[in-house]
């Protein structure tokens, strides 16, 4: 068993080493991003008028690459303009769509928009995936709280999205009443 020659050891260990270094770099970047957002929590992002239909269609189109075969992508976003920060809104929606893609084997992933009042808008991301266990919901937005044993994440994605939502004058919540998968609601006050 211990008779592997040095060349074979190097061949085996080099890809593993590179993969671990890459994972560490990604974790360090995620930690730095989270800390930076936390330190600037009260500094809200600059907002600009933009067409959210165009943005949401584009985000969904890119996200579909990660969808499993047979998963339907649905965008129900009207052609309206709202004041927001396109880059930061895209960061949140990309993360939510990537999570949905990872845990949805069949059915659909949908992104919709609802205007709740003149100054309150919701982006609702719904999937027919595995859902989030009741016991994990409490720690969902806490840093480093992995909720699945098989996840590839670092436990900072949803907490980071929650901070970004706050800096966009909004909130990110899990719809605990939805039982056919997972539904997140990003509510922005503009």
Where are these regions (language model features)?
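Short beta-strand/loop element within the Bergerat-fold HATPase_c
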Residues: 108-119
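Short helix-loop "hinge" at the ATP-lid/N-box region of the Bergerat-fold HATPase_c
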Residues: 100-101
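Short alpha-helical segment of the dimerization/phosphotransfer core of two-component systems
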Residues: 19-27
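Short conserved segment of the HATPase_c
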Residues: 132-144
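Conserved micro-motifs of the catalytic ATP-binding
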Residues: 39-45, 81-84
């Amino acid at each position: 068993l211990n008779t592997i020659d040095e060349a074979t050891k190097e061949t085996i260990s080099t890809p593993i080493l590179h993969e671990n270094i890459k994972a560490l770099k990604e974790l360090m970047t995620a930690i730095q991003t989270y800390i930076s957002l936390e330190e600037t929590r009260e500094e809200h992002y600059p907002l600009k008028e933009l067409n959210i239909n165009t943005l949401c269609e584009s985000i969904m189109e890119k996200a579909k690459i990660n969808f499993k075969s047979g998963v339907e992508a649905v965008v129900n976003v009207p052609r309206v303009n709202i004041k927001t920060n396109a880059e930061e809104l895209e960061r949140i929606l990309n993360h939510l769509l990537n999570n949905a893609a990872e845990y949805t084997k069949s059915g659909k992933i949908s992104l919709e928009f609802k205007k709740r009042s003149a100054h309150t808008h919701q982006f609702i991301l719904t999937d027919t995936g595995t859902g989030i266990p009741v016991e994990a919901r409490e720690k969902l937005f806490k840093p480093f709280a992995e909720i699945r044993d098989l996840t590839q994440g670092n436990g900072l994605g949803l907490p980071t999205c929650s901070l970004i939502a706050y800096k966009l004058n909004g909130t990110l919540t899990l719809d605990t009443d939805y039982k056919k998968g997972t539904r997140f609601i990003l509510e922005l006050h503009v």
